């Protein structure tokens, strides 16, 4: 659907070019940056505030890159930029790279974008740049689905192809969604001066005027939504409770927005489920395009981009060995069959038969399924450490929280150290990222969290099993050998909080191997037939907090009190985007997820009955 004509990228689908024949970069700067008075608005930003831009039509990303460059050049420190864009037909890596190569002056910015581009997923993508000061939320979906799902825009770039060639982007309904997603005082600019656009924006509530266009275009439109811009006061201090992946990610997201963060952990860093020797990046997608599907997919893409920043792929701390999700049962075959019909890029996943699955894995497998080439494993404790690199974060271990008390300025946290000495901290906001034990606190007692014990098993590799190159998932998971041992798991025991290793659960983990591979069946039989071998197997137990429906509890529970709880076995992929959601909500910034997903994650909607906590002076 794309072609190059006279050095310009041309869409055969819409019969239009992606950028001006005169100068694509200069046109973007004139129409969108000058048209929205961005230089003046960036320079006048107050500390600890963010400016948000919405765009209809990401295209080559040129508008985003020149906006990012301008913001970094002139915006005061301790300010940030949110850029939201919609693109139904994204360019592939080669097309995007070739297009951006036309502007070498944007090379460093384009290189950063290309690194994230290889991690894009259908639906919503959230990527951070410039040390977290610039955030891009890219919705790869139809504009009619994306626009109703966001809000809080300060300036709009109304791009896309011309109204005559792409009328679906310029309807009255689109303009009403744009107005509804805008803050008071929001502006817009667009290269077109078409009457249908002017009248539609006016009907949506914008004040519209014509000004001189760029190059051969005689006129363009700009305007604003009447009303004074809102005053936004972001918090400056935060306490995060819980030193696992969810807590460390929350601390990192808040610190990147300029908050001073104190992180409390009752044991040592990553001592709970985040302390497993390796963790699996498992993106189990539901077949229906529901909130859970959209959340897991967005989480997966965000997690891969975040890991690229934090953890090297070195085979010790992280491996991008890929994951095979096998059609081992009728139910899984139906789920995988529905997903396989989606026309998605192969770098996200692709269907494979048993023969190709076996070739990818390096051992014979009994089933085909879905191949996720970007998945793999990592060492969760190392990710915890990497997330706490900011000097704005102070870690306190051995601190057990006893109470949370609201105050007129935020929250007071009472804790005990390992010597049972009382300890107290105060901050404007508190983020709770612990396990099921959080229900001992009155403010969180009504959340639907259930303890679930999980046991994983570590099995010495054999000559045959050593050939396994990928993660294999059936009713459980089986990892390639790491330091001479495979990890297999995990059991699920609801309302069981014991932490001792159980031989019967080792046997249960091994039994899952029989169904997916002759090689693993032999390995399972060799170990399972000798009780002494079972008793000598190493492993690890952890207790997670589980919630009904598999959606974690993420968001604001009470004024200034936030949660990121119940991530379950998907925590390695869902904790990062959840941290972004909490931080963006607390700071009044553009949200990284669709509003329907945000509502599905809300702890308020699932706390029952109403939480009896009153704000004290």
Curated annotation (Swiss-Prot):
Residues 1-226 are annotated as: tRNA (mnm(5)s(2)U34)-methyltransferase. SUPFAM superfamilies: FAD-linked reductases, C-terminal domain (SSF54373), FAD/NAD(P)-binding domain (SSF51905). One of its GO terms (molecular function) is tRNA (5-methylaminomethyl-2-thiouridylate)(34)-methyltransferase activity. Residues 241-617 are annotated as: FAD-dependent cmnm(5)s(2)U34 oxidoreductase. It is found in: Cytoplasm. GO terms for cellular component: cytoplasm. It comes from the Bacteria. Its EC number is 2.1.1.61, 1.5.-.-. One of its GO terms (biological process) is methylation. It catalyses: 5-aminomethyl-2-thiouridine(34) in tRNA + S-adenosyl-L-methionine = 5-methylaminomethyl-2-thiouridine(34) in tRNA + S-adenosyl-L-homocysteine + H(+). Keywords: Cytoplasm, FAD, Flavoprotein, Methyltransferase, Multifunctional enzyme, Oxidoreductase, S-adenosyl-L-methionine, Transferase, tRNA processing. Its cofactor is FAD. In the N-terminal section; belongs to the methyltransferase superfamily. tRNA (mnm(5)s(2)U34)-methyltransferase family. In the C-terminal section; belongs to the DAO family. Catalyzes the last two steps in the biosynthesis of 5-methylaminomethyl-2-thiouridine (mnm(5)s(2)U) at the wobble position (U34) in tRNA. Catalyzes the FAD-dependent demodification of cmnm(5)s(2)U34 to nm(5)s(2)U34, followed by the transfer of a methyl group from S-adenosyl-L-methionine to nm(5)s(2)U34, to form mnm(5)s(2)U34. PANTHER family: SARCOSINE DEHYDROGENASE-RELATED (PTHR13847), TRNA 5-METHYLAMINOMETHYL-2-THIOURIDINE BIOSYNTHESIS BIFUNCTIONAL PROTEIN MNMC (PTHR13847:SF283). This is tRNA 5-methylaminomethyl-2-thiouridine biosynthesis bifunctional protein MnmC.
């Amino acid at each position: 659907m794309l072609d190059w004509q006279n050095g310009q990228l041309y869409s055969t689908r819409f019969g239009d070019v992606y950028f001006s024949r005169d100068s694509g970069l200069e046109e973007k700067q004139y129409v969108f940056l000058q048209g929205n008075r961005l230089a003046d608005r960036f320079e006048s930003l107050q500390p600890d505030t963010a400016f948000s831009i919405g765009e209809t039509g990401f295209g080559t990303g040129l508008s985003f890159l020149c906006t990012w460059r301008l913001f970094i050049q002139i915006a005061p420190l301790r300010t940030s930029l949110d850029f939201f864009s919609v693109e139904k037909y994204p360019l592939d890596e080669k097309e995007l790279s070739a297009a951006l190569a036309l502007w070498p002056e944007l090379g460093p910015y384009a290189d950063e974008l290309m690194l994230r581009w290889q991690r894009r997923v259908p639906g919503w993508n959230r990527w951070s740049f410039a040390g977290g000061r610039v955030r891009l939320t890219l919705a790869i979906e139809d504009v009619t689905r994306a626009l109703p799902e966001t809000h809080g825009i300060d300036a709009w770039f109304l791009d896309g192809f011309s109204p005559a060639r792409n009328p679906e982007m310029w309807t009255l309904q689109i303009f009403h969604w744009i107005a509804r997603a805008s803050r008071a005082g929001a502006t817009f600019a667009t290269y077109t001066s078409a009457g249908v656009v002017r009248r539609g924006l006016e009907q949506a509530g914008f004040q519209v005027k014509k000004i001189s266009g760029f190059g051969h275009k005689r006129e363009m439109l700009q305007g604003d939504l009447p009303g004074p811009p809102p005053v936004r006061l972001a918090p400056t201090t935060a306490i995060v409770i819980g030193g696992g992946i969810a807590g460390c990610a929350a601390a990192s997201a808040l610190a990147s927005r300029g908050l001073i963060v104190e992180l409390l952990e009752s044991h040592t860093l990553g001592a709970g489920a985040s302390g497993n020797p390796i963790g699996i990046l498992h993106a189990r997608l539901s077949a229906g395009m529901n909130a859970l599907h959209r959340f897991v997919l967005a989480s997966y893409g965000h997690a891969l981009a975040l890991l690229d920043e934090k953890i090297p792929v070195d085979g010790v701390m992280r491996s991008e060995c890929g994951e095979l999700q096998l059609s081992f049962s009728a139910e899984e075959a139906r789920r995988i069959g529905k997903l396989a019909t989606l026309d998605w890029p192969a770098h996200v996943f692709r269907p494979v038969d048993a023969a190709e699955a076996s070739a990818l894995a390096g051992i014979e497998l009994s089933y085909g399924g879905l191949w996720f080439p970007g998945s793999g494993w990592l060492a969760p404790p190392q990710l915890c450490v990497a997330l706490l690199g900011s000097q704005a974060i102070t870690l306190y271990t051995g601190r057990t929280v006893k109470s949370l008390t609201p105050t007129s300025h935020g929250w007071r946290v009472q804790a005990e150290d390992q010597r049972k000495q009382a300890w107290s901290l105060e901050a404007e906001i508190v983020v709770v990222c612990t396990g099921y034990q959080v229900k001992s606190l009155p403010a969180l007692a009504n959340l639907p969290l259930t303890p679930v014990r999980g046991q994983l098993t570590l099995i010495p590799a054999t000559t045959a099993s050593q050939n396994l190159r990928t993660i294999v998932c059936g009713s459980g998971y089986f990892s390639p050998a790491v330091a001479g041992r495979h990890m297999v798991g995990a059991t699920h025991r609801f309302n069981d909080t014991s932490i001792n290793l159980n031989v019967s659960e080792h046997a249960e983990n091994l039994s899952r191997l029989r169904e997916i591979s002759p090689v693993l069946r032999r390995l399972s039989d060799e170990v399972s037939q000798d009780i002494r071998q079972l008793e000598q197997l190493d492993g690890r137990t952890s207790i997670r907090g589980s919630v009904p429906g598999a959606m974690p509890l993420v968001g604001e529970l009470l004024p200034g009190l936030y949660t990121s709880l119940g991530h379950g076995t998907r925590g390695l992929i869902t904790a990062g985007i959840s941290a972004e959601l909490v931080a963006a909500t607390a700071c009044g910034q553009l949200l990284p997820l669709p509003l329907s997903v945000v509502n599905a994650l809300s702890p308020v909607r699932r706390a029952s009955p109403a939480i009896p906590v009153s704000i004290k002076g």
